[in-house]
Amino acid sequence: MHPPAPDAPILFFDSGLGGLSVLGPTRALLPTAPIVYAADYAGLPYGRKSNEELAARVPALLGRLVERYQPRLAVIACNTASTIALGHVRAALDLPIVGTVPAIKPAAEMTKSGVIGVLGTEATVRQPYVDDLSARFAGGKTVLRHGSPGLVTGAEARLRGETVDPEVIARAVAGLRDQPRGDAIDVVVLACTHFPLLKDELQAGFGRGVALIDGAEGIARRIAHLTDGQAWPAIAVPGIAVFTRSDERPPPPLAVLAPYGIGSIETV
């Protein structure tokens, strides 16, 4: 396989804007990397879709995007899509694919109380994959889960400069705290890439004694490792954001995306 051209982009894919929480740390490690950020607004929210629907939708859409933008690597910057469709995507596409998995392993290493919370979408927290991660890396620990669709909507609103409903945060916190042993949680895994965008609000809700962790920096390091030795442009060029068309959800203003190095918006 020939090495990629310097202008071959990294493709980030999410249901919405949550993947920006992964793009940020990646930009820090690879500041001149060309970026295509794709958000499936026509399919948002993924957390309420069936496994079968996502297993068909995500590989098909990524296939179109790969054909159009010819990336050197694709990042599924979405826990729900990764836990359900990562294997299907890897089988369908002939390029490196980086997925997003709940950070249960580092949470298990960090907890002192032995009680870990996992906050994700409804689809992510019901996956057997999360059972497997818990069994492999958190044996002997209590792993409590809660699916919070409201946080996805809240994160999208937050990025647009809108106020986040405090009740959304309170319900997410209570969803873990009100379970048996929930009061002993000292580490919460943010198992949706949207949720770190609300880290300040969630930290206030859980209290300073609870550590909030996510996998974004680990994913960025993985991307840097997989592209080590490849050529990049000498200077950064503005990235492209691509949104699937949605009548009820127009793309955000470019000003929302500009801090992440995005310079233009397209729809497909």
From Swiss-Prot:
Give one GO term, molecular function aspect. glutamate racemase activity
Gene Ontology terms describing biological process: cell wall organization; peptidoglycan biosynthetic process; regulation of cell shape
InterPro entries listed in its UniProt record: Asp/Glu/hydantoin_racemase (IPR015942), Asp/Glu_race (IPR001920), Asp/Glu_racemase_AS_1 (IPR018187), Asp/Glu_racemase_AS_2 (IPR033134), Glu_race (IPR004391)
- Keywords assigned: Cell shape, Cell wall biogenesis/degradation, Isomerase, Peptidoglycan synthesis
Catalysed reaction equations from the record: L-glutamate = D-glutamate
Q: What Enzyme Commission number(s) apply to this enzyme?
A: 5.1.1.3
Q: List, alphabetically, the PROSITE patterns matched.
A: ASP_GLU_RACEMASE_1 (PS00923), ASP_GLU_RACEMASE_2 (PS00924)
Please give the superkingdom of this protein's source: Bacteria
Task: Name the residues annotated as catalytic in the UniProt entry.
Answer: C78 (proton donor/acceptor), C192 (proton donor/acceptor)
Task: Give the function comment from the record.
Answer: Provides the (R)-glutamate required for cell wall biosynthesis.
Give the family per the record: Belongs to the aspartate/glutamate racemases family.
Any idea what this protein is called? Glutamate racemase
Please report the organism this UniProt entry assigns to the protein: Sphingopyxis alaskensis (strain DSM 13593 / LMG 18877 / RB2256)
